[in-house]
C-alpha cells in the first residue's frame, strides 16, 4: 500500500512539473546590476539576486516574462509602451536593461481617462491638443514621472493601438496602459481571447511598477465574455496575482490601483464583483484607486484609507464636445508626491493648471436656477467653499446634484439644437454629477462673494453682481405648454428650470383658496363634470358660487385650443393653493432642485360682482394671506395685484409680504397710477407694451424691480432682456430660457448609471 502511495505521489509531481520550464535572465541598468527586482510570468514569482540574475520555473504556456519595474528606473518606452515585459514563447533567457530616472521617493503620476478612439477624425483630435498639452506638462516635471491611460484606449477599432503608441511617446514620459472593455476583440469569445490583440500590442493585463516607496498595481477588472458583454469585477486569476505581488510590497508603501472600471458604481453605490476580496488582500495600506470607464469625474471614499478617483475622459464626450457629459472639461489628473505628501489636480486640456472651478450665474442651472452654482470637478470634502451675501457671512455652500449648463449648450450646438437626437445616443445625454455646490441668495441681494480654497491651499474669489440675470417666470405655470394653473403646469415649469412660478388665486363658496386665473370656468379650457364642454356664451359658472368638491370635478386640461397649439392636452383639475405649494415644495426636494420662487396674484377687483361672484377685497386678501403665510416662503414669495385697495390693505396688515403692483397697457401716466398707492412696492409689473427705457429708468430711480407681463414673442422677449428688466412673465418659458441660458432642455429623470 505504501509503495502504491509513493508511486501516486511521483506521478502527481511529474504531472505538476510537466507544464513548467526553467528560464534565466538578468535585470540591469547599464553596468549596474539590479538586485531584488521581482520577476514573474503572471503565476510564478522570483527576485533577482545582487548580481541582477534570476532563474525560476515558468508555465510552459506562459505568454510573458516580466518585471515589477523598481523605483528609480523605467524600461525603454520609445515604442509607446514601457518594455518591462518580453515574450516567453520559445525563449529560455531574458535580459531587461532599464533606464535610471533618479533616486528618492518623490515623483509625478498622470492618470488619463478614456481616449476611446474609433476613427481617423477622433485620432486627429487626440494627437493634437491633448497630446500637445501633456507634452508641455511633461517638460515641467522635475521628478521621475509616469502616466497611466485607464482603459478604452480604442473604441472597438483596435488597429488604432499602433497609432496611439506612436503618439503617446510625445508626452516625454512613460505611459502605462490599462485594459478597458472597448480594448477587447468585439467578437472574441471569453475573457482571455478577448484581450489577445491588446496583449500583443500592450503586454500583460496585470502588472505593477514602483514609484518612490509606493507601488502601482495595474489590474484588468473587465471580465469579458463576447460582443461587448462583460462584468466589472475581479477574476480569480487576478486576485491570485495580487496575492502573490503583495508578498513583495513593503508595509510602508502606499498603493495605487489602476483599473478601467470604477470600484464603486455611482450612483447606485454598489461595489463591483469580488471587490471585498481585493480589499481584503490590500488592506493595511493607504490605497488610491485610479479608474475611468464612466467618463465623469468623481472622488469617493470607499472605506478608511481607501479612496477612489474616477477620472473623466480625455475624449470629452466621445470627441463630440470639449466637456464630458457631467460638465468636466476634457483632461487628465496629475499627482505629485513630495516629502511624503501627495497632492493632485485635474488638468483641463488647453487650460492653465489653476483652471479648477466654473461659476454659473443664477438662471443657468436647470436644477438650481435661483442659485449661484460652482462646478468644482475635482471636488471632495477637503475643499473649503464659503459665500457672503452683501458682505454678510452665509457659511458653506451646499453640495448638490446638478447637470452642466455648459455641456448642454455644447450638445445643442453639436446636435444643431435637436436635443431629441440624443435619444438615439443616450449615453451622451447630460449626466448628473455630485461636484457642484450652490449658494441660494435672497432675490433682493445685490452682491454675492464666493471664496474657494482647494485642499492644497490654492484660492479663488468670485464677486457676483446679482442684477446680471433675468428671473424667468412661468405665467400660470407656462400656459402655452401645459394646462394653466395646474399641478402639471407647475411640475413642467420646475423641470424646465424656471426661477419663479406665477399663478392666480380665487376663493370658493366654502372659503377654500383655489388656484385659478378666471373667476369662473372659461370656455377655452373647461369641461363640466358631466362631460359637456363649457362654450363661449354659456352662463358663467363662478368659482365663488361653488364648493371646492364640485370645482374639482371640472376637467380643465383635456380641451384643445387653437390659440395654444403647443399646449399639452390632459385631464386635470384646479388645485387648492395649499395643495399646490405642498406639491411644489415636496417635488423640488424629491428631485434635488433648489427652492423655487412664487409670484402669486390675488384676483381682487372693483365692480358690481364684488361680494357676489368674488369676495370683497379685504376678505379675499385675508383668506389668501392666511394660507400663504402658513407656508413660510419668506422672500421667495411675491404677492401681486392690480387692485390698489388690496395692495394698500396688504401693506398695512401684512407688512411681511413682498408686493408687486400690476398695471395694464392703459395705465397711463406713471406718477398718476403710482399715486393710487400709499406706499412704494418692491416690484412694478407693467404690461410689456408700455415698457421702455424711460419706465425702466423711473423704476431704477425709485428702487423698484420690474417684471413685465405677459411676453411671448421672441423679439419682445429679447427687447425686455436688452432693457435689463429683473424678471419676465411668459406663457412660453422655454422660449425665454433659450434666450437667457441657451437651452430649454428639461432636467433629467431618475439617476441612471451610464458607462460606455
Regions found by a protein language model. Name each.
Residues 21-24, 28-43, 60-61:
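Short, ordered, surface-exposed loop/turn motifs in non-cytosolic proteins
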Residues 306-392, 429-443, 447-459:
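Binuclear metal-dependent phosphoesterase catalytic core
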Residues 404-438:
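Aromatic sugar-binding surface patches on proteins
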Residues 22, 29-30, 71-161:
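N-terminal active-site segment of His-dependent metallophosphoesterases
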Residues 60-75:
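A short, solvent-exposed beta-strand micro-motif common in secreted/extracellular proteins
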Residues 374, 464-756:
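Phosphate-group recognition and catalysis centered on beta-loop-alpha active-site segments
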Residues 43-57:
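Short, acidic Ser/Thr/Gly-rich low-complexity loop/linker segments typical of extracellular
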Residues 74-75, 158-251, 272-290, 299-338:
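Extended active-site neighborhood of metal-dependent phosphoesterases/phosphodiesterases
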Amino acid at each position: 500500500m505504501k509503495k502504491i502511495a509513493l508511486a501516486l505521489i511521483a506521478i502527481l509531481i511529474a504531472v505538476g512539473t510537466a507544464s513548467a520550464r526553467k528560464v534565466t535572465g538578468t535585470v540591469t541598468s547599464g553596468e549596474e546590476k539590479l538586485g531584488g527586482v521581482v520577476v514573474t510570468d503572471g503565476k510564478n514569482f522570483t527576485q533577482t539576486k545582487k548580481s541582477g540574475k534570476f532563474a525560476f520555473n515558468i508555465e510552459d504556456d506562459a505568454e510573458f516574462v516580466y518585471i515589477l519595474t523598481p523605483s528609480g528606473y523605467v524600461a525603454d518606452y520609445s515604442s509607446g509602451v514601457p518594455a518591462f515585459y518580453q515574450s516567453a514563447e520559445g525563449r529560455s533567457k531574458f535580459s531587461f536593461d532599464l533606464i535610471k530616472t533618479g533616486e528618492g521617493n518623490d515623483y509625478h503620476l498622470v492618470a488619463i481617462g478614456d481616449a476611446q478612439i474609433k476613427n481617423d477624425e477622433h485620432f486627429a483630435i487626440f494627437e493634437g491638443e491633448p497630446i500637445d498639452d501633456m507634452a508641455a506638462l511633461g517638460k515641467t516635471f522635475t521628478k521621475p514621472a509616469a502616466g497611466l491611460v485607464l482603459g478604452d484606449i480604442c473604441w472597438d477599432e483596435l488597429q488604432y493601438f499602433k497609432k496611439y503608441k506612436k503618439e503617446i511617446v510625445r508626452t516625454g514620459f512613460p505611459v502605462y496602459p490599462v485594459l478597458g472593455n472597448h480594448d477587447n476583440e468585439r467578437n472574441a469569445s471569453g475573457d482571455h481571447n478577448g484581450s489577445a490583440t491588446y496583449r500583443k500590442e500592450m503586454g500583460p493585463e496585470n502588472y505593477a511598477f514602483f514609484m518612490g516607496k509606493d507601488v502601482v498595481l495595474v489590474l484588468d477588472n473587465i471580465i469579458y465574455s463576447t460582443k461587448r458583454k462583460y462584468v466589472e469585477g475581479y477574476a480569480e486569476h487576478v486576485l491570485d496575482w495580487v496575492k502573490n505581488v503583495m508578498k513583495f510590497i513593503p508595509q510602508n508603501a502606499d498603493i495605487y490601483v489602476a483599473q478601467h472600471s470604477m470600484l464603486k458604481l455611482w450612483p447606485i453605490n454598489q461595489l463591483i464583483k469580488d471587490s471585498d476580496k481585493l480589499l481584503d488582500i490590500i488592506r493595511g495600506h493607504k490605497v488610491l484607486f485610479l479608474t475611468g470607464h464612466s467618463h465623469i469625474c468623481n472622488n469617493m471614499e470607499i472605506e478608511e484609507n481607501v479612496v477612489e478617483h474616477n477620472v473623466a475622459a480625455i475624449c470629452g464626450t466621445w470627441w463630440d464636445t470639449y466637456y464630458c457629459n457631467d460638465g468636466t472639461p476634457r483632461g487628465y489628473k496629475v499627482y505629485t508626491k513630495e516629502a511624503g505628501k501627495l497632492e493632485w489636480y485635474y488638468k483641463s486640456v488647453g487650460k492653465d493648471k489653476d483652471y479648477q472651478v466654473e461659476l454659473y450665474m443664477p438662471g443657468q442651472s436647470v436644477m438650481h436656477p435661483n442659485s449661484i452654482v460652482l462646478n468644482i470637478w475635482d471636488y471632495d470634502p477637503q475643499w473649503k467653499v464659503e459665500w457672503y451675501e452683501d458682505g454678510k457671512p452665509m457659511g458653506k455652500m451646499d453640495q448638490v446634484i446638478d447637470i452642466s449648463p455648459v455641456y448642454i449648450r455644447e450638445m445643442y450646438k453639436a446636435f444643431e439644437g435637436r436635443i431629441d437626437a440624443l435619444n438615439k445616443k443616450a449615453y451622451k445625454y447630460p449626466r448628473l454629477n455630485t461636484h457642484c455646490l450652490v449658494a441660494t441668495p435672497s432675490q433682493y441681494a445685490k452682491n454675492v462673494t464666493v471664496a474657494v480654497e482647494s485642499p492644497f491651499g490654492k484660492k479663488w474669489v468670485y464677486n457676483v453682481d446679482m442684477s446680471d440675470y433675468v428671473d424667468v417666470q412661468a405665467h400660470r405655470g407656462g400656459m402655452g405648454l401645459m394646462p394653466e394653473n395646474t399641478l402639471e403646469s407647475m411640475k413642467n415649469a420646475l423641470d424646465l428650470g424656471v426661477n419663479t412660478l406665477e399663478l392666480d388665486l380665487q376663493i370658493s363658496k366654502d372659503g377654500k383658496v383655489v388656484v385659478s386665473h378666471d373667476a369662473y370656468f372659461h370656455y377655452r379650457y373647461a369641461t363640466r363634470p358631466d362631460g359637456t364642454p363649457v362654450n363661449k356664451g354659456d352662463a358663467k359658472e363662478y368659482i365663488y358660487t361653488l364648493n371646492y368638491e364640485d370645482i374639482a370635478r371640472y376637467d380643465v386640461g383635456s380641451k384643445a385650443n387653437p390659440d395654444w397649439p403647443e399646449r399639452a392636452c390632459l385631464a386635470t383639475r384646479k388645485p387648492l393653493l395649499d395643495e399646490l405649494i405642498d406639491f411644489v415644495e415636496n417635488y423640488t426636494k424629491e428631485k434635488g432642485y433648489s427652492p423655487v420662487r412664487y409670484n402669486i396674484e390675488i384676483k381682487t377687483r372693483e365692480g358690481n360682482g364684488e361680494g357676489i361672484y368674488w369676495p370683497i377685497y379685504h376678505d379675499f386678501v385675508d383668506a389668501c394671506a392666511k394660507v400663504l403665510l402658513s407656508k413660510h416662503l419668506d422672500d421667495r414669495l411675491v404677492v401681486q395685484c392690480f387692485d390698489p385697495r388690496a395692495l394698500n390693505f396688504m401693506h398695512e396688515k401684512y407688512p411681511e409680504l413682498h408686493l408687486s403692483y400690476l398695471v395694464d397697457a392703459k395705465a397711463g401716466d406713471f406718477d398718476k397710477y403710482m399715486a393710487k398707492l400709499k406706499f412704494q412696492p418692491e416690484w412694478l409689473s407693467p404690461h410689456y407694451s408700455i415698457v421702455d427705457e424711460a419706465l425702466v429708468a423711473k423704476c431704477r430711480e425709485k428702487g423698484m424691480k420690474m417684471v413685465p407681463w405677459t411676453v411671448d414673442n421672441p423679439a419682445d422677449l429679447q427687447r425686455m432682456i436688452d432693457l435689463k428688466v429683473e424678471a419676465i412673465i411668459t406663457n412660453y418659458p422655454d422660449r425665454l430660457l433659450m434666450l437667457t441660458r441657451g437651452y430649454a432642455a428639461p432636467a433629467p429623470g431618475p439617476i441612471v448609471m451610464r458607462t460606455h
